[in-house]
Amino acid sequence: MGPMGFVAVGVGAAVGAWLRWFFSVTWNAINPALPYGTLASNLVGGYLIGLAVAFFETHPSLPPEWRLLAVTGFLGGLTTFSTFSSEVIANLMAGDYRWAMLHLAMHLGGSLLLTAFGIWSYRALA
């Protein structure tokens, strides 16, 4: 990949990380046991990756930098498996097993459902 690929990933990642930070500072304090900002980042990212998968599947002639910008950069910066993991572990270490399991179910199940819904949405509108 050429220099434009690096630029595309970097720009997308910066914007995605800023949005994730905004979600976190806006919503995480509402419920520390299930930080809504992290959940929003992962669910919105799950839906958008579904849209992106369907979009790029139907537009194979687009330059690869667009996929790098949107998927690797923006969605990689927006979604956060590491923060999600640390929040689940914090719940487990505090003995909040119910919150830990709810956290797991909402992030993983919700993201998978919204990814499928994103693909379906794009195909329904295309």
Swiss-Prot record:
Membrane-spanning intervals of the chain: 5-25, 36-56, 69-89, 99-119
Pfam family, one: CRCB
Main location: membrane
UniProt binding sites for Na(+): G76, T79
Membrane topology: Multi-pass membrane protein
GO biological process: cellular detoxification of fluoride
Keyword RNA-binding: no
GO MF, one annotated term: fluoride channel activity
Catalytic activity: fluoride(in) = fluoride(out)
Alphabetic keyword roster: Cell inner membrane, Cell membrane, Ion channel, Ion transport, Membrane, Metal-binding, Sodium, Transmembrane, Transmembrane helix, Transport
Regulation: Na(+) is not transported, but it plays an essential structural role and its presence is essential for fluoride channel function.
Subcellular location: Cell inner membrane
Gene Ontology CC terms: plasma membrane
Family: Belongs to the fluoride channel Fluc/FEX (TC 1.A.43) family.
Job of this protein: Fluoride-specific ion channel. Important for reducing fluoride concentration in the cell, thus reducing its toxicity.
HAMAP family for this protein: FluC
The protein, known as: Fluoride-specific ion channel FluC
Originating species: Cupriavidus metallidurans (strain ATCC 43123 / DSM 2839 / NBRC 102507 / CH34)
